[in-house]
Curated annotation (Swiss-Prot):
Source taxon at top rank: Eukaryota
GO cellular component: cytoplasm; cytosol; eukaryotic translation initiation factor 2B complex
Protein name: Translation initiation factor eIF2B subunit beta
Chief subcellular location: cytoplasm
One biological process term in Gene Ontology: translational initiation
Organism from which the protein derives: Mus musculus
Cellular compartment(s): Cytoplasm, Cytosol
Amino acid sequence: MPGAAAKGSELSERIEGFVETLKRGGGQRSSEDMARETLGLLRRLITDHHWNNAGDLMDLIRREGRRMTAAQPSETTVGNMVRRVLKIIREEYGRLHGRSDESDQQESLHKLLTSGGLSEDFSFHFAPLKANIIEAINELLVELEGTMENIAAQALEHIHSNEVIMTIGYSRTVEAFLKEAARKRKFHVIVAECAPFCQGHEMAVNLSKEGIETTVMTDAAIFAVMSRVNKVIIGTKTILANGSLRAVAGTHTLALAAKHHSTPLIVCAPMFKLSPQFPSEEDSFHKFVAPEEVLPFTEGDILEKVSVHCPVFDYVPPDLITLFISNIGGNAPSYIYRLMSELYHPDDHVL
C-alpha cells in the first residue's frame, strides 16, 4: 500500500533525525523533551508497523531502542523510556493473558531463586493489545507533562521561612521547586556558579526575577559557606540503580561539604531519570567536552605541554544523599531498588 509505505518512510526519517540529534549531543533539549520525543516515536512505531504478537513488538522496540541509546549512551532518559514501554507491553499482554500484576513482580529472594529463569511466552495474538498499549503510553505522556508541577507542589513541606538554601548550576526542576516555595515563604538562595560552564548565573537571574534573595558564588567557596546553609537542593542528570547520582560536575564537592556539616541534601528529580544502570558502566557514565573554557586556545605555549580533560558529570554516592523528591513523593536512596522494580522489568535492564 502506497500510504503505508509513505508512513513508514516518514517514520524512518523521524527516527533517523532523532538519532542524528542524539549523536550531536541532543542540542539544547531538556531530559523531559528527550523523554517525550522518545515516547512519541515508539508510539508511532507501534501504530505504523505490522506485528503479530507481543514478542514481535518487543523485538521491534528493543531493536530501535538499541539504535537510539547507542547514538548517545550518556542520555539515559532515552533508554529509560524504551524500558518503560517494554514494561507496558508486558503488563498489557499479561492482563489479556489472564495473569495478575502481582505475579509479575519478583518481591522476594525466594521468588528470585525459585523462578529458575523461565521465559514467558509472548506468541499469543490478542486483538485489543495495540489499543491498550497506545492508551497506556498516552497516560505515561500525560504523567510526563505533570512531573515538574508535582515535584514543585511538595516545596512547602521542605523549605521554611528564613532558611538559607544552596544549589549548584541550573536545573529547571529545582528552579520550579524554589519558585513555588517563594510564593508563600521568604528565604535566601546561594547558587554555586558551576564553572567552567557557569550555568549557575542563569539560575540566579531567573530566581532574582521572582523576587527571591539570591547570591552567586564561586565553586571554591562552597565549603566556607556551607556552615550557614540549612539545606542543599540540587537536580541531577540520572539517578543510578544503587541510589547514586550522575550530576553536573561540582556536585560531588557540594555533597561532601554538606555531609561534613550535617546539612541535608535533597535531590529533585522526576521518575523518568531513574535508570537501571550502575556507575561501573563507563560508556554511558562519562561524557567529555572541549576544554576551551578551562584552558583557552590563546594559551598556546601551555597547550603543547598538557593534556586537558573536561568531564561534564560527577558521581555522587548514595550515602551523601538525604532524600529524593520525585513526582510520586519523597524517598530515601535505600528505596530506589523498589521503585526500579515497579518501573522496569529485570529482563529489560539490558536492551
